[in-house]
Amino acid sequence: MAEASSLERQSPRVASCLVHSLCPREPSLQTTAVVSMGSADHQFNLAELLTQNYNLQEGCAEAPQCPDKPEEELDKDFIDQSSDMPLDELLALYGYESSDPISEQESEGGDTAPALPDMTLDKEQIAKDLLSGEEEEETQSSADDLTPSVTSHEASDLFHNQSGSRFLAGDNGPGSSASSDTEEDALPANKCKKEIMVGPQFQADLNILHLNRHCDKIYENEDQLLWSPSVLPEREVEEFLYRAVKRRWQEMAGPQIPEGEVVKDSEQALYELVKCNFNVEEALRRLRFNVKVIRDGLCAWSEEECRNFEHGFRVHGKNFHLIQANKVRTRSVGECVEYYYLWKKSERYDYFAQQTRLGRRKFVSSGTTDTEQDLDGLDPDGHARLHSEAGVPVEPLNVDIEAGGLDQPGVGSDDLPSSEPGPRPFQQLDEPPAVPSLQQPTSLAASAELPPAAAAAPEPGTSPRLPVDLALPEELPLVSSPVALSEDTAEPMAPAQVALSVTEFGLIGIGDVNPFLTGHPACPTSTLHSEPLSQCNVMTC
């Protein structure tokens, strides 16, 4: 019996409660219950504990005035009132053994800790106490007398949620712990402690696969030797790599590798050396014309390569295949394209463009101005086609007709030419000449109004011209067929002096020159002038 009482003190719990006359005016709230508070020797009236010093009767008296007051508010009032209870009454209310009033008087408010059970928050200790209590209850047949059941169900209606959680928490505790233990036992062992599966017993057996693929080839191509380090000494290999990477194809004199120089490996260059049967000079010769093998990023271009590229660009334009094939053999086409876009953003390109524009101005005539053109649009024949397309503006043939005295040999009365040169009086002909009247175009008429000196003077801004004065025979027409001629002649006209201003003699065909030279008597005398060649007049008979 003493062991049972000590068990009750270690695991206190409320088995039943007694609520009596909490509200005497409310019959539905009247309940009778017996409460066992941790010890069978002490029984307390729950109604006396609640009504002492807290005026519960006043709250029950107000209940008829508020018949619709919910149970939640009643529970809230009960919680508020229980929060102000002294410690002894609160311990007695929740099933702990209350201290004796006589011992309290003797101790005069002394320490109550020795009378209290050992309270702890350690879950393992609580579970151990609960399990030990359950084992003792199974062995003892009188355990049911220590925990009497609740005889009235109306108390649960009074304490809707609070009573179930507080007064019956002890009853649900062992059951819940037991159920949790069963759940833990049901879990697999690997979930708590996972085993690392390492070892031959956990490996897959691949012997069958190896037997099946023993006769199959992994790949069809034959193996190739890429490099063999045991053929050449390490020093010679480093010298080869230095010459290959630095583009030094000739044999070096003196110390082969500069002191402190770091030589990087090049698998492509070493493979080329293997293909040449470790002949260094032959491998370097191949690398010189096969730059793709030793290409490691965009290597720095030498000054000679830059000049060759610029010359090739000036000749071939953007045809990088021709530039690489004819000018820059040490670089690939892709490197030429990449260098071109980097070159356009550099100062070297600006200087190249300036020199190219200056060279083009030398071939352009003085009267025209060179327009700013992008060098990207140039082609190899850009300079030659520039002059043929632009050309020099061709002016129409200027024909100046002067009637009156002409500087030609005179004709006598006997129809023989006179030997005396000089102006002769104009003789009226009986019949009009065979030469029709010439209708001058607007440009010719404008030039005819000017004096001969002004008409023969060269225009500013044009190339110097060579005026030629020709005396035509009577039978020869003055102009060619493209000029419109009027059939009606208003008055007869005599042969006139013709001044031909020719800019380019290529416009005059050989057929147009022969009639001037054939079938005409030779000129007896020729007049020489001291004027410059550009202003001299050549007189012909």
UniProtKB/Swiss-Prot annotation:
The modification Phosphoserine is found at S11. Residues 296-348 form the SANT domain. Its main location: nucleus. GO terms for molecular function: DNA binding; histone deacetylase activity; histone deacetylase binding. InterPro entries: ELM2_dom (IPR000949), Homeodomain-like_sf (IPR009057), MIER/MTA (IPR040138), SANT/Myb (IPR001005), SANT_dom (IPR017884). It comes from the Eukaryota. Coiled coil: none annotated. Residues 194-291 form the ELM2 domain. Pfam families: ELM2, Myb_DNA-binding. The keyword Nucleus applies. Residues 100-119, 131-186, 364-440 are annotated as: Disordered. GO terms for cellular component: cytoplasm; nucleus; protein-containing complex. Keywords: DNA-binding, Nucleus, Phosphoprotein, Repressor, Transcription, Transcription regulation. Residues 140-165 have a biased composition (Polar residues). SUPFAM superfamilies: Homeodomain-like. Part of a complex containing at least CDYL, MIER1, MIER2, HDAC1 and HDAC2. PANTHER family: MESODERM INDUCTION EARLY RESPONSE PROTEIN 2 (PTHR10865:SF27), METASTASIS-ASSOCIATED PROTEIN AND MESODERM INDUCTION EARLY RESPONSE PROTEIN (PTHR10865). Transcriptional repressor. This is Mesoderm induction early response protein 2. It comes from Mus musculus. The lineage of its organism: Eukaryota, Metazoa, Chordata, Craniata, Vertebrata.
